[in-house]
C-alpha cells in the first residue's frame, strides 16, 4: 500500500497468531509493505511496532508528542464531538464529527494525518468529517422498536464492544439492551471477563454461532 494506517493493536485473532508477539510481527510486515505509515501514538502496541521499522511515519493522538493532536475536545450534542487538530503545535483544522463516539476522534485524526502527505487541504478534512455519517454495521441505526432506536454494530471484541456501549451511554439513553452474538466461541471463552465488563450495565442476550462448543 502507498500508505498504511494502524489505529490500534489488541489481543484479537490469537487463535490464529497464538501470541501478541506474533500478532505484532504481522502488523510489522504490513507496515514494511507501506511507503508511509500513519499510526496512533496513544496505543502502546502500535508504538512498539512502529519503533521497529524504518519508514516515513506520521503520528496522531491526544498525546502531546503526536504530530497531529486533538485538543479542545467538546461534545456539541450527546455522544458527538468537535475538536481542534494541531499539526506540530499549529492549528490544522477544526473537526466536527458527523458520527457519534469518542473513539471516532482517533479515526478523524488518522484521516487528517493521511491528508497531509496526500496533498489535501484542511478544509477537505473538515468537510469529510462533517459529511461522513457512518458505514454499515458501525453504530448503524436500523429502525425503531416501541420508539427505541435499534442499532447494529459489528463489535466482536471487548474493546470494540466497550466503545459501542460507551457511545450509547453518552447519547443519554436510559435503558440499553445488548443482544450479543459471539462470532467465535474460542474468542468469547478467552476474553469472557472482558466481554462481561463491556456489557455490565446492560441487559444481555447471547445468540449461538455455528462454531463447535469449546
Which residues are covered by each model-predicted region?
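Acidic, Mg2+-coordinating active-site environments of NTP-dependent enzymes
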Residues: 1-150, 173
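Charged helix-capping and loop-helix junction motifs
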Residues: 21-24, 189-197
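Structural beta-sheet core signal
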Residues: 39, 178-180
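Cofactor-binding loop segments of dinucleotide-utilizing enzymes, especially the Rossmann-like FAD-
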Residues: 62, 181-183
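Structural/interface elements that position substrates and couple domains in central-metabolism enzymes
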Residues: 151, 155-161, 198, 210
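Active-site glycine- and acidic-residue-rich loops that bind
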Residues: 155-159, 184-189
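Glycine-rich phosphate/diphosphate-binding loops that line cofactor/substrate pockets in enzymes
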Residues: 167-176, 201
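Residue-level detector of conserved catalytic or cofactor/ligand-binding positions
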Residues: 199, 203-214
